Amino acid sequence: MKHIAGQYYHIYNRGVEKRNIFASDENYRFLLRRIKEFLPEYSLTFIAYCLMPTHYHFLIRAEEDGSISPFIQRIFNSYTQAFNKQQNRSGTLFEGRAKSKIIDETSYLFHIARYLHLNPVRAGLTLKPEDWIYSNYREFIGLRKGTLYDAAFVREQFETPEEYRKFVEDEIPNEIMRRLEKYMLDDD
């Protein structure tokens, strides 16, 4: 997919055969360091992210045509090489290339961010989204300062971090969930 400047995309992928892509906390931290290291070289903005044991989700805005694919390829080639070396394994780590879905209805952007931030709760990994440290939910609600976060984007919709927290804690209406399905990973 050719990523177009000014558009928002849900980027995701999962491990081969739904296997874990992170074997330790250090693996999560390594990937986040790589993202922060490489991000300044690319014209894109991270809106929301969530790293899960078997998959990842990014909500990204392309600031320049074609900026997302080279970035994703670079960080995950680097990550896969490091992971394979650490785990004494070889071969592919992911189910093919990253998937990308354009968010053509911008009114759903915050619902998608909420969906991503609730992923660890739905998976039974935590009781509250703020307990999962491998997403930027804590930035959204003011518990952590981070660089993979667009504060202006959040303030466009929510006056305070507490408003976003309440939005996330409210159940996603079924009608909204049905509409979000076209933007989501199959069998999440």
Model-predicted segments: where are they?
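Short Pro-Cys-Gly-centered "Cys-loop" motif that presents a nucleophilic cysteine in a tight turn
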Residues: M1-I47, M52, R61-D188
